């Protein structure tokens, strides 16, 4: 507990909060150009080939961003939109690429959670394909 004299001399120090996505510079999203698109493996105990891209943002910062969903059309020089959001089992990946915006296509044949993957609503006349995991066994 500080004395009154110590408070007069030094004052209270304000806690500085650290942002989880510093490259966005307080913006909700940022545009960037893919410099490298590749796959990487997650930390233990998980096992997969996660799709990621190295992106050079409009503010000249280079970050690693995750490509969500099944299949993608990204390659070098593709223009993408990134948002914050880390991938827990990929160290150093603190951003997500927004599907369905700029050069990134939406996920094909996506029926549920479509807005998160940039998928358009299926046509009303088209026959509904059976959804995996749903139905009788």
Swiss-Prot record:
Entry keyword RNA-binding: yes
Stretches assigned to coiled coil: none
InterPro entries, alphabetized: NA-bd_OB-fold (IPR012340), Ribosomal_uS12 (IPR006032), Ribosomal_uS12_bac (IPR005679)
CC annotations in GO: small ribosomal subunit
Segments of skewed composition (Low complexity): 116-137
Modified residues (3-methylthioaspartic acid): 89
Keyword tags: Methylation, Ribonucleoprotein, Ribosomal protein, RNA-binding, rRNA-binding, tRNA-binding
Pfam families linked: Ribosom_S12_S23
Keyword DNA repair recorded: no
Location of the region described as Disordered in the Swiss-Prot/TrEMBL record: 101-137
UniProt cross-references to CDD domains, sorted A to Z: Ribosomal_S12
GO molecular function, one term: tRNA binding
GO biological process, one term: translation
Family from the record: Belongs to the universal ribosomal protein uS12 family.
Function description: With S4 and S5 plays an important role in translational accuracy. Interacts with and stabilizes bases of the 16S rRNA that are involved in tRNA selection in the A site and with the mRNA backbone. Located at the interface of the 30S and 50S subunits, it traverses the body of the 30S subunit contacting proteins on the other side and probably holding the rRNA structure together. The combined cluster of proteins S8, S12 and S17 appears to hold together the shoulder and platform of the 30S subunit.
Subunit field text: Part of the 30S ribosomal subunit. Contacts proteins S8 and S17. May interact with IF1 in the 30S initiation complex.
Protein name as catalogued: Small ribosomal subunit protein uS12
């Amino acid at each position: 507990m500080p004395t009154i004299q110590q408070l007069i001399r030094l004052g209270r120090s304000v806690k500085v909060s650290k942002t989880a996505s510093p490259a966005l510079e307080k913006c909700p999203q940022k545009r960037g150009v893919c410099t490298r698109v590749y796959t990487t493996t997650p930390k233990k105990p998980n096992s997969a080939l996660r799709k990621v891209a190295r992106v050079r943002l409009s503010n000249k910062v280079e970050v690693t961003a995750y490509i969500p969903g099944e299949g993608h059309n990204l390659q070098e020089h593709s223009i993408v939109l990134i948002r914050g959001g880390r991938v827990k089992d990929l160290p150093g990946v603190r951003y997500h690429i927004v599907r369905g915006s700029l050069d990134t296509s939406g996920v094909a044949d996506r029926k549920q959670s479509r807005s998160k993957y940039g998928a358009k609503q299926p046509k009303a006349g088209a026959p509904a394909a059976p959804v995996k995991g749903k139905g009788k066994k």
